[in-house]
A protein has these predicted regions:
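Aromatic-lined substrate-binding rim segments of carbohydrate-active enzymes
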Residues: 64-72, 79-128, 205
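Conserved, mostly hydrophobic/aromatic
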Residues: 43, 78, 109, 181, ...
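Bacterial N-terminal signal peptides that target proteins for export
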Residues: 2-12
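N-terminal carbohydrate-binding accessory modules
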Residues: 25-77
Length: 307
């Protein structure tokens, strides 16, 4: 079939329109890749040297100061729990302002040259009241926490959806600095309900968090706490055991100790907890020299006073 000049012009225009529509509808470029034993971020292999930092426990006016200090001590990443009961104190009423403005905390971290690892729970532990669960859940009769109880999951979904509205625009794939998101928290030390874990995993994805997901557990709890589609990471595991445990689930890693404990917390009225610096310094040096990514829990000290 012979085409005249006008037909060719129309086809060229149609091709341009189709190409534009395809590019505008395509998903954001994947900026974080996990594989070959490493985290690849924006095309570069990165060893995560991270520190845990809790925005509600630092006065708002000191956020930037603490983030600057984190960068100055050689960290390239901060890890942050999100505390559900800090944002939804009444059912369906969310607060992300002032001290609760976690989006500002994350943007400030980006301005200071830091990646962020987000740990939204819904359960977080963190030596925080009710593990981060809102107290109004206690009024719900016959509600089973940390389970696939449909009512419980509906509350989790409402919280995670709202969190997605606030924070999913800040993933690195969307131009921000959130590089990974954690599914639940040390669930393997509590139960082994894979359907529950999968439900939380899917909620996080559906909320718009388009970066790699991970779980964290002690070495003996990974089997119970791991869920398909998430990188298994470790808490309080050192030396060659890091490789042995992770390789059972993701051969070749990458290897990430999501909670490395250089010290421990004090409890009011009890003897001060102290750790000689030599042993954790030796453990940290070993991990860094063997390419293991690590997050120090904690990187900033706090006093948490109970009501």
């Amino acid at each position: 079939m012979k085409m005249n000049k006008n037909h060719k012009t129309v086809l060229v225009i149609l091709n341009i329109i189709v190409s534009f529509l395809i590019s505008s509808c395509s998903s954001p470029k994947e900026q974080v890749r996990i594989g070959n034993g490493t985290f690849t971020i924006e095309g570069k292999d990165v060893q995560l040297i991270c520190g845990e930092m809790h925005y509600p426990r630092i006065p708002h006016e000191y956020w930037r100061d603490r983030l600057k200090r984190a960068r100055a001590m050689g960290l390239n990443t901060v890890s942050a729990y999100v505390f559900w009961n800090f944002h939804e104190r009444q059912p369906g009423e969310f607060d992300f302002s002032g001290q609760a403005d976690i989006a500002e905390f994350i943007r400030t971290a980006q301005e200071e040259g830091l990646y962020v690892i987000l740990r939204p729970g819904p359960y977080v532990c963190a030596e925080w009241d009710f593990g981060g669960y809102p107290s109004w859940l206690l009024k719900e009769k016959e509600l089973t926490y940390r389970s696939k109880d449909p009512r419980f999951l509906s509350y989790c979904e409402r919280y995670i959806k709202e969190l997605g509205k606030q924070l999913s625009p800040l993933t690195i794939n969307n131009g921000g600095n959130i590089i990974m998101v954690q599914v639940e928290n040390e669930y393997g030390s509590y139960a082994a309900d894979k359907e529950y874990l999968a439900a939380i995993r899917d909620m996080i994805k559906e909320a718009g968090f388009n970066v790699p997901l991970f779980t964290c557990d002690g070495g003996g709890q990974v089997e119970a706490g791991h869920v398909e589609g998430a990188l298994p990471t470790l808490n309080g595991v050192f030396g060659e055991d890091i490789f042995k445990v992770v390789d059972k689930y993701q051969k070749g890693g990458p290897y990430f100790v999501a909670e490395f404990y250089p010290a421990w917390f004090d409890e009011w009225g009890r003897r001060h907890s102290s750790v000689a610096y030599e042993r954790p310094a030796e453990q940290l040096d070993w991990m860094l020299s063997h390419g293991v990514s690590v997050s120090m829990y904690m990187s900033v000290s706090y006093t948490h006073l109970r009501a």
